[in-house]
Structures are given as C-alpha cells and as structure tokens.
Amino acid sequence: MGEIRKPIKKSSIEKKNKILEKGFTLMCEKGYHNVNCVDIAKYAGVSTGIIYQYFTDKRDIFIEGVKNYSSKIMFPMIDILDNTKIDKNNLEKILNSMIDSFINTHKMSKKAHEELISMSHIDDEINQIFKDNELKINEKIVNTLKYNNFNVKNLNEKVHIIIGLIDNFCHEIVYHAHKSLNYDEMKKEVINIVLYLLKD
C-alpha cells in the first residue's frame, strides 16, 4: 500500500472530500460492517486505488466522517443558537424550535444516528470523539447563555442535564413511540423543566 498523501490541489481536496462524504454516508446507511472500500469507491465514482491514496482503510474514512459530520447529526440545535438572539422573553419559542429541529434531524438521519451510537459502543476512538464533541457543545451553549445574560448557578451542569433531557425526548418520539403517551404534553413538560432550570 502506498503512502497516504495530504491533498494540496483544489481538485485533490475535492476528491478526498467526496470520498469522505460518500463513504461515511454509505457506512451510516448500510452499516459499517456491511461496507468495504470497493463499495465506497463505486458509490463515490472513483477507483479503489484512489481511496488508498487518501485513507488507510474504511475505518479511517469513518473516523474522519465522525469528526466532520457527527455534531450536525447529533446536535442540530447549534445552528439555531448561532443565528438567534436569546433572551428570557423568547426562550420558550427558541426551545420549541430547537426541539423540533432535533426531532426532524433524528428522523432524517435515523440510520446514521443509530450507526454512530452503535460504533461509539465498540470503538474507543469514536467514543472519545463523541465525548469531546458533547463537552464542546455543552460549553458552546453555556457560553451563549452567559453572553445573553443567563447568570444561573451551576449552569454547566444544568446545560448537560438539558441536553440529555431533550435528546431522550427525541429518542422517545423517533425510536420508541409509545402510543399511551401524549408527546405534545410531554414536549410542554420538557420545556417547562428547561425554563425552570434556567431561572435566576
């Protein structure tokens, strides 16, 4: 196997990114263990040899994919925080939007989400990337709230609880779907808990 090269030319960078995007998507859709580099090459429209110019193996592609795309799949609410001024008067509305975004992304990326979680349980490096991303997201939300004058005691810990609460609610809707539960009412309860946690 030849030496792994770092692309410099624009065309080479685009080719590597295409392999990364297509390969990661394919492994998320079909399952990591059901895909090989030949499958990825075919899906990306390149030769297998080209793949080995940029990546060691399919795990290398998956790891890079996790680093580049997992936050968008797992934490879509960040886009809303980046583009919205938050204050105590519009917090409830923003929470509604964040939860809806989280649910929709879980539904659209259901297979990818499942595969990422599955791989995080069996691969220490992927698990560590998730842990690091989780802390970065937590820190970003805390800093955003502080910037918008949410001066709450134990804010770091409360934000961690809030992320877990919203994530659990989304999983309930997307994966469990208990017919005996009213999800509109549950959503209201989730928002009420978050509002309570963020009170001065």
Where are these regions (language model features)?
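Helix-turn-helix
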Residues: 14, 18, 22, 26-60, ...
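Short, basic, alpha-helical segments at the C-terminal edge of helix-turn-helix-like DNA-binding modules
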Residues: 37, 67-73
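Hydrophobic/aromatic-rich alpha-helical bundle segments in the mid-to-C-terminal region
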Residues: 114-116, 147-193
